[in-house]
Amino acid sequence: MYAVAGTWRLDLSMRELQAQALKGIVAGVRQSPGFVRGFWSRDVDEPDVSVTYVVFETREQALAFRSAVEANAPAQADSGVSRTGLRLAEVQADA
């Protein structure tokens, strides 16, 4: 399995819009080919930071998802979200 791990900076003045957008994002990601599991979280120590981790069956599926996320930067910006990191990770173990 492969995961796309992201870190994001959030404009907290747009929190309501981000919460609404997240519902649609999660629903859409669930439909992605090879989707296994996803997590969207907010950093406890830095509330304007979000951490995401989305797992796919294959490297190719994860790469395609990462490309789609990168291409979606304008919509992210419209919601007060800026990407600070986006990594492809090979899952070594799960529990």
Predicted segments, located by residue:
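Glycine-rich beta-strand-turn "strand-cap" elements at beta-sheet edges
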Residues: 2, 9, 37-48, 71-95
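Short phosphate-engaging motifs
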Residues: 13-14, 25, 48, 61
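Short, surface-exposed ligand-recognition loops at beta-strand->loop->(often short) alpha-helix junctions
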Residues: 9-21
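An amphipathic, aromatic/His-enriched active-site/gating alpha helix that lines ligand/cofactor pockets
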Residues: 23-36, 55-88
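Short hydrophobic/aromatic beta-strand micro-patches
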Residues: 7-9, 53-55
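Short coil/turn motifs at secondary-structure junctions
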Residues: 11-13, 43, 57-59
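Intrinsically disordered, low-complexity acidic/polar segments
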Residues: 15-17, 61-63, 95
